[in-house]
From Swiss-Prot:
Role played: Found in functional membrane microdomains (FMM) that may be equivalent to eukaryotic membrane rafts. FMMs are highly dynamic and increase in number as cells age. Flotillins are thought to be important factors in membrane fluidity.
Spans through the membrane: 24-44
Encoding gene (name): floA2
Assembly with partners or alone: Homooligomerizes.
Keyword Transmembrane helix: yes
Domain of life: Bacteria
Record-given protein name: Flotillin-like protein FloA 2
Membrane topology designation: Single-pass membrane protein
Compartments in which it is found: Cell membrane; Membrane raft
Length: 362
């Protein structure tokens, strides 16, 4: 194998003792140069496609930027494509730079979604959205593209939402009739309130509260059935979209049904409660009457005992009267005759002798 001319001349001019060292150094140098060429070729082939795309589209992303993204662990393909989309769409925001895209990517944002949202806002011509606002919305956890689309094309929210435990909003008019309502709320995203503003759940809760209040203030449920638009107007006047991420465009009553007669049910429950109270009061009075009757029977028994005690003293009194001469034998028989006449008259008059009355002791 023929050696190169320069290496041959160098070897011929050097002493024979130094030839092995020079050969080793040349080989090492050749390997280093070869490795460098391989690395350069690898880098060139890896980033040439992205670089040529950026050059042809006017995105102005240099090789140095591409290599730096790799060392910073940034997805170069996502950054280049996002920058190309922004350039082709004519986004002229001065804050929309390669460094800003890298920073948003490293912060955990969705770069391509932000660029798509900016392009959609620019095409709509009615939405003012800057790159800073779009990245802030994206980092706040909101879908910035969906928000822009909702701002352009209003979104319909069911109230109550589909799949909820209660299929309708129940409210009672002043006449006591229950109405079951389902509404549809058309909202448009408010990009200025999207960060920190309330979400769909708040809109649903506020609209439900407004519908219940509007029905509750109606004097007659028939008026609500005849003109459901009364509910929508009453709810829209309250500005329920304040401090929310949406702007309410319209509230439409999708369905309204008549429920139970809550007023009659409440009256029946009240009547039942009044009946229970009256029954309890009557039971109390009956118990008091029974107690009073028992007390009277006790008084009667006490009086009868006193009568029996007094009757037991009569024979002793008569004996004492006989001994003292105050009562003679003829007087006693005369008294017995009068008592017998009295008993006979009672018998003739139909009055039986009271068995509880003790007989007089002779």
């Amino acid at each position: 194998m023929r050696r190169p001319m320069i290496a041959s001349l160098l070897l011929d001019t050097l002493p024979l003792a130094q030839m092995p060292k020079v050969t080793t150094a040349l080989l090492i140098g050749a390997l280093v140069i070869f490795a460098g060429i391989v690395v350069v070729l690898f880098i060139f082939t890896s980033y040439f496609g992205l670089w040529i795309q950026s050059v042809l589209t006017g995105s102005k992303i240099s090789f140095g930027n591409l290599i730096g993204m790799t060392f910073r662990k940034v997805n170069t393909r996502a950054i280049v494509r996002s920058k190309i989309m922004a350039t082709q769409a004519g986004l002229d925001d001065p804050e929309l730079t390669v460094g800003a895209l890298e920073a948003h990517y490293l912060a955990g944002g969705n770069v391509q979604q932000v660029i798509r949202a900016l392009i959609a806002a620019k095409k709509a011509k009615t939405i003012s959205l800057t790159f800073r606002e779009a990245t802030a919305i994206d980092l706040a956890g909101r879908d910035v593209l969906e928000s822009v689309q909702t701002s352009v094309y209003p979104k319909v929210i069911d109230c109550p939402p589909r799949g909820s435990a209660k299929p309708s909003l129940d409210a009672v008019a002043k006449d006591g009739i229950q109405l079951k309502v389902r509404a549809r709320v058309t909202v448009r995203a408010n990009l200025q309130q999207l960060i920190g503003g309330a979400t769909e759940e708040t809109i649903i809760a506020r609209v439900g509260e407004g519908i219940v209040s509007a029905i509750g203030s109606a004097d007659d449920h028939k008026a609500v059935l005849e003109n459901p638009d009364v509910i929508s107007k009453a709810v829209l006047v309250k500005k329920l979209d304040s401090q929310t991420a949406f702007e309410i465009v319209s509230i439409d009553i999708a369905d309204i049904d008549v429920g139970a007669n809550i007023g009659a049910r409440l009256q029946a429950d009240q009547a039942e409660a009044d009946t229970a109270v009256a029954r309890a009061n009557a039971e109390g009075r009956r118990a008091a009457a029974v107690a009073e009757e028992q007390e009277m029977q006790a008084e009667i028994a006490k009086s009868q005992a006193q009568v029996v005690e007094a009757q037991s003293d009569v024979p002793r009194a008569m004996a004492e009267a006989f001994r003292s001469g105050k009562l003679l034998v003829m007087d006693y028989y005369r008294l017995q005759n009068v008592s017998a006449d009295t008993e006979m008259r009672r018998a003739l008059a139909g009055h039986s002798h009271d068995p509880d009355t003790p007989e007089e002791t002779h």
